[in-house]
Amino acid sequence: MAENLYFLKLKKPITVDNTNEIIVYKYFMITTYATNGALAVALTPGLEDSYDTIILSVNLDAESLALPQGEFFLDINNLERTLIQQLDEEGYIKPASESAISGYVVYPAVHGLMFKQCERVEASE
């Protein structure tokens, strides 16, 4: 796996009914994929890089977003509304302030060092 890939284990798994298919997500998958340090965040059932995971966040330029330290923009759409609601209820995310970009922000680490209620798990595990 890529050196810039690691996982954050959720303390409480998130269960989503996705078009009559129940999926239990246990990890955030964190990866950087651009020279400017862009971050992608996905939920994944296990410790593997899977193309069918849901990409929840792309932080294309942390500098230009001007969000508070320890936060980054989480881009969402209606297809992910149920999942976003569950992540919100469990305390993994919080709504952005009215003065910020519309959507959600994930915290507390812009650089993916740690998320609230998660423990880091190396990709090699």
Where in the sequence are the language-model features?
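Intrinsic disorder/low-complexity signature
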Residues: 1, 14-15, 72, 85
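Short, Lys/Arg-enriched, disordered terminal segments
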Residues: 1-4, 123-125
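Low-complexity, intrinsically disordered short peptide segments enriched in small/polar/basic residues
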Residues: 11, 19-21, 51-55, 90, ...
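Acidic, aromatic-enriched beta-alpha/helix-loop junctions
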Residues: 42-86, 91
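Short, compact, well-ordered microdomains
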Residues: 76-125
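Long, low-complexity, charged/polar intrinsically disordered regions in eukaryotic proteins
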Residues: 2-49
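Hydrophobic transmembrane signal anchors and adjacent membrane-proximal interface regions, especially
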Residues: 5-10, 56, 65-67, 72-74, ...
